[in-house]
Regions:
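Short beta-strand element of the alpha/beta-hydrolase
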Residues: 81-93
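Short glycine-enriched nucleophile-adjacent loop
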Residues: 207-218, 350, 520
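Conserved alpha/beta-hydrolase
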Residues: 145, 149-164
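C-terminal, loop-rich substrate-recognition/catalytic regions characterized by aromatic stacking residues
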Residues: 370, 377-648
Length: 648
C-alpha cells in the first residue's frame, strides 16, 4: 500500500514537473513571438546586454568651445560592447546628469521635481547602496533609455554651451543650434563605437533642438523623436494670445538658476572641479538661459526688437522658418504631445506642414509627462519600434500604422485610443453654439447664460461684467506642468466670478475632437483688456471640469495670414503695427482658437464656456483701478459663439 502511494506521488510529481516545463517553454515561445503594434513591441531583436558603462568627458567644437558629454555603452558581464552601435543623442540645455545630494548629504534635487516622500526615500537608499547612487544620469531620468541600451544602443548626452559643465556662452538661436548639432553629429559618427546611424530624442526645448538638427541634412541623423516641442515659441508659450505667460516664465527663470547651482556634474577627469569652475566663470557675464525669461518681458510683440536689433520671436526662437529645409532633407519625425501640454496646437501645425515620414501621438497628459511610459501608453515600446526601424533597418511595420494616434479623454479605456490619417479627422463637423440669456433661478455665475445651437433673434442683447482680477485657472495649470503634473481644481469657484454659457443636460454623449474656435463680440469702457475662454464639462452636481482654454488680448485681435499652413485657424500676427485699441462705445470681435482637445462629454452632463478677463496665477494682465466694465454682446447682429469640432 505504501509502495502504491509512493508511486502515485512520484507520478504526480513528474506530472507537475512536466506541466511546469511545458508552461515555461510556451511562455518563452510566446515571449519570442513577433509583436509590433501601437504601444507593444517584442520579438524583433534580442536583449543582449545586462549592464552599462558611463563615461563623461569633453568634446571640442570647431570654434574651440569645449562641451561636456555623457557617453553610455551597453555591457555584458562588465565587458563593454565590442562592436559599433547605433547612437541615441540628446543635445540639452538642461544638464546631462544631476548631483542629488551635496557634500553634507543634503537633498538638493527634489525641489525641482516636487518628489513625494517615498521617492525621496528611494533616492536616499540608492545613495547609500550604489557606487554612483549620488548621480541622476540619463538612464535614471528616462527609464525607456535603459531598455534601448539592453537592445544594443549607445547613448550620448551633450550639454549646450554655457550650461552645465560646458564652456562658452548659450546662444538660443536655432540657426546656431543647427550648426552645433551638425558638428556634434559628425563627431559622434566618427567614434569607433558608433556605426554611423544616429537618432535624437528629448522633450520641450530639447525637442525643438531636434527640429533644428533635422534642417541640416546631416547624413548620419536617421530619425528624430521630439516630444512637446513647438514651432512658434511666441504664441505657443511666452505670449499666448499676446498676453505674457508669467507662470511659465517665472518657473523657467527659477529652474535655470537651479540648474546653474551645485547640481552640475563635472566630467570624470575633473576630480577637483577646476574645469567646471572655469566654465562657470567664463559665462558669468553672459546672457545665459536664466535671463531669457527676464528679457522676454521687454519684447511683447512678435516683431519686437532686442537690444541688438534682432527680432527674437521670429529670427531666434521660431522654428517655422526651418520647415522647408526639414522637408528638403526628409529626416523622419515622430512627434508626441499631450492634450494638457503647452504646445499641443504647435504639434498639429508641425504635422500639417511636414512632408517627411512622420507620426503624431497625442496623449491625455501634460508637458512633463508625455515622454515617459504612463497609464495610457508604453512609450518605451514606441521609441524602440521607431529607432529599430530607422536606425537598425528592422522592418517592424511601424510605418504601416495610421499616422496619427490620439486619446479620447472621458471614454472607456478600451475605446480611448483613436486613429486617423488626416487632421482634423475627416468625419469632424463644426457645430456652432451661440451665447444666450441667463436661466432664472440659477446662481452658478455672474449671468448663468445658455449655450444654444440656434442663432439669437433679439436685436439687442448683452451681459454686463466688471472685471475680476482674482479669476484663475489655478496655480497647478498646464502652464506650470513642466517639472510636475497639472492638477486643475473644480472650476465652479472660478465660474462663480465669471460669465458662463452652458447647454442643457446632453441627451446623448458628445465627442469634441479638434480645435474649438470662439467668437466674442464686446464693448468696453477701456481701450484694452484680456479675454480668457475655458471649455468645461459640468456634471449633475454642478461640478465643473476643465477641458481646454484659449485667450486673446483685445488690442491683438487683428487677423492676418500665417507663414505656414495653420489649419484654417484664426491667425494673429501680434505685430506692433497691428495693435488696435477698443474704440469707445463700439463693438469689436475677438476670434481665436482654444487649444485642441479630444473629449467625450457624458450623457446627462453639460457643456460650458466660461469667460473671464484675467488668469491671475498664470498670465500678466495689467490691473486697472477702478476695474473696467465689459459688455459681452450676444444678439442677432453681434452673435458671440463657439464652434465646437464634433465627431459623430
Amino acid at each position: 500500500m505504501n509502495k502504491l502511494i509512493s508511486a502515485k506521488m512520484i507520478y504526480a510529481l513528474i506530472g507537475v514537473v512536466l506541466v511546469i516545463a511545458v508552461f515555461l517553454v510556451y511562455k518563452r515561445q510566446a515571449g519570442q513571438a513577433k509583436v509590433s503594434e501601437f504601444g507593444k513591441y517584442q520579438g524583433y531583436s534580442e536583449a543582449m546586454y545586462g549592464g552599462t558603462k558611463r563615461v563623461s568627458d569633453y568634446l571640442t567644437l570647431s570654434n574651440g568651445t569645449k562641451l561636456a558629454y555623457d557617453f553610455i555603452l551597453p555591457t555584458q558581464k562588465d565587458v563593454p560592447a565590442n562592436k559599433p552601435l547605433p547612437v541615441l543623442f540628446l543635445y540639452t540645455p538642461y544638464l546631462r546628469t544631476f548631483i542629488i545630494f551635496d557634500e553634507d548629504g543634503k537633498d538638493i534635487i527634489s525641489g525641482l521635481y516636487r518628489l513625494k516622500w517615498y521617492e525621496k526615500a528611494y533616492l536616499r537608499v540608492r545613495y547609500w547602496i550604489y557606487d554612483r547612487g549620488n548621480l541622476m544620469d540619463p538612464l535614471f531620468r528616462k527609464k525607456w533609455l535603459g531598455n534601448m541600451v539592453k537592445y544594443g544602443y549607445a547613448v550620448v548626452v551633450v550639454e549646450r554651451p554655457g550650461t552645465g559643465a560646458s564652456f562658452g556662452k548659450l546662444n538660443p538661436s536655432f540657426e546656431v543650434v543647427a550648426k552645433e548639432t551638425n558638428e556634434i553629429l559628425n563627431w559622434i559618427a566618427a567614434q569607433k563605437w558608433c556605426d554611423g546611424n544616429i537618432g535624437m530624442y528629448g522633450e520641450s526645448w530639447q525637442g525643438a533642438i531636434q527640429l533644428a538638427a533635422a534642417s541640416t541634412g546631416n547624413p548620419h541623423l536617421k530619425a528624430i523623436f521630439p516630444a512637446a516641442s513647438w514651432i512658434d515659441n511666441y504664441s505657443a508659450i511666452m505670449y499666448s494670445g499676446g498676453v505674457y505667460n508669467k507662470a511659465f516664465s517665472d518657473f523657467f527663470t527659477w529652474s535655470q538658476k537651479f540648474l546653474s547651482s551645485n547640481v552640475i556634474t563635472p566630467v570624470d577627469h575633473d576630480k577637483d572641479g577646476i574645469q567646471l569652475a572655469q566654465a562657470r566663470e567664463e559665462r558669468r557675464s553672459a546672457i545665459v538661459s536664466e535671463k531669457i525669461a527676464e528679457a522676454s518681458r521687454k519684447i511683447p510683440f512678435r516683431d519686437s526688437l532686442s537690444p541688438d536689433g534682432n527680432k527674437v520671436w521670429i529670427d531666434t526662437m521660431a522654428l517655422y522658418p526651418f520647415i522647408d529645409r526639414i522637408n528638403q532633407y526628409g529626416i523622419p519625425v515622430y512627434m508626441t504631445t499631450g492634450w494638457y501640454d503647452l504646445c499641443t496646437r504647435d504639434n498639429f501645425l508641425l504635422y500639417a506642414n511636414l512632408t517627411v515620414p512622420k507620426r503624431l501621438v497625442v496623449r491625455p497628459l501634460d508637458h512633463e509627462q508625455v515622454d515617459e511610459t504612463q497609464f495610457d501608453l508604453d512609450y518605451a515600446a514606441e521609441a524602440h519600434r521607431w529607432f529599430d526601424y530607422w536606425l537598425k533597418g528592422i522592418n517592424n511595420g511601424i510605418m504601416d500604422d495610421p499616422p496619427i494616434h490620439y486619446y479620447l479623454m472621458g471614454a472607456d479605456k478600451k475605446y480611448a485610443w483613436n486613429v486617423t490619417d488626416a487632421w482634423p479627422p475627416k468625419n469632424q463637423e463644426s457645430v456652432r453654439y451661440y451665447f444666450g440669456p441667463g436661466v432664472t433661478g440659477e446662481t452658478t455665475s455672474i449671468n448663468n447664460g445658455t449655450l444654444d445651437p440656434s442663432p439669437p433673434t433679439a436685436p439687442e442683447a448683452s451681459d454686463n461684467y466688471t472685471v475680476d482680477y482674482t479669476t484663475t485657472s489655478s496655480n497647478h495649470s498646464r502652464w506650470t506642468a513642466v517639472n510636475w503634473t497639472h492638477d486643475y481644481p473644480n472650476m465652479r469657484s472660478n465660474d462663480a466670478k465669471a460669465l458662463t454659457y452652458t447647454t442643457p443636460p446632453l441627451e446623448k454623449a458628445a465627442q469634441v475632437t479638434g480645435h474649438p474656435v470662439i467668437h466674442v463680440w464686446l464693448k468696453s469702457d477701456v481701450p484694452d483688456l484680456d479675454i480668457f475662454a475655458y471649455l468645461e464639462e459640468v456634471d449633475g452636481g454642478g461640478n465643473s471640469t476643465y477641458i481646454t482654454e484659449g485667450n486673446l488680448r483685445a488690442s491683438h485681435r487683428s487677423l492676418g495670414q500665417a507663414p505656414y499652413d495653420n489649419l484654417g485657424l484664426p491667425y494673429h500676427c501680434h505685430y506692433k503695427s497691428d495693435m488696435a485699441p477698443i474704440p469707445a462705445g463700439e463693438p469689436v470681435e475677438l476670434a481665436f482658437d482654444l487649444l485642441p482637445t479630444s473629449y467625450l462629454f457624458r450623457k446627462g452632463n453639460r457643456i460650458r464656456v466660461t469667460i473671464t478677463c484675467a488668469d491671475a496665477d498664470n498670465f500678466e494682465t495689467p490691473v486697472l483701478n477702478p476695474a473696467p466694465k465689459l459688455h459681452l454682446l450676444r444678439d442677432m447682429n453681434y452673435p458671440s459663439s463657439i464652434q465646437l469640432p464634433i465627431v459623430p
